[in-house]
Amino acid sequence: MIREARLDEAEALAELQRDASVAAFAHIFPPERYPYPLDEVLARWAEAVENPNLTVLVAEVAGTPGGVAGCRAEWLDGLYVRPEHWGHGLGRKLHDEVLDRLRVKGSPRCHLWVLEDNERARRFYEGLGWRENGDTRVVPFPPNPIDVGYTIELETTLATP
């Protein structure tokens, strides 16, 4: 089931993001060199859940958050799935719900950033129709990897049935 996040879930969402990030980014941010900033991430999720300009969606698995996605006008700000649920369609369901909600709000396209060396995520998004848009940026925290910009045109993307 996909639903909007609740403020009382901020800690669970921060822990979910930590688990997914450590599993996905250990080759970019080795945890022994770059400890995960759990307190900062917790504060950001608490703020995001209460922000009326953001939508935070939770994919519930057995009554607990198995995945989370945050979006705002024309942006998918983050999509995280617990590693034990990778490859089972949970990320796709969250992704599709985010795009459907943006379509309903009239967004003609959606953008996101993906770490250049996150090959799994890049394959995921490219397989769903996202294309590199030519934008790059340096991530503002060490070791300062590169983010690659992606865009998907929503008017040409079928909504979830």
Segments the model singles out, each with a brief description of its role:
Residues 1-15:
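A short beta-loop-alpha structural element at the N-terminal edge
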Residues 6, 77, 82-86, 115-116:
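Residue-level recognition of the GNAT/N-acetyltransferase active site
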Residues 15-44, 54:
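Conserved GNAT-fold acetyl-CoA-binding loop/helix
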Residues 42-58, 75:
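A short helix-loop-beta-strand connector motif used in the catalytic cores of GNAT acetyltransferases and
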Residues 58, 64-80:
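Conserved beta-strand in the GNAT
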Residues 59, 85, 89-97:
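Conserved acetyl-CoA pyrophosphate-binding loop and the N-cap/start of the following alpha-helix
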Residues 93-109:
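Conserved acyl-CoA
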Residues 108-122, 126-131, 135-161:
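C-terminal "cap" of GNAT-fold acetyltransferases
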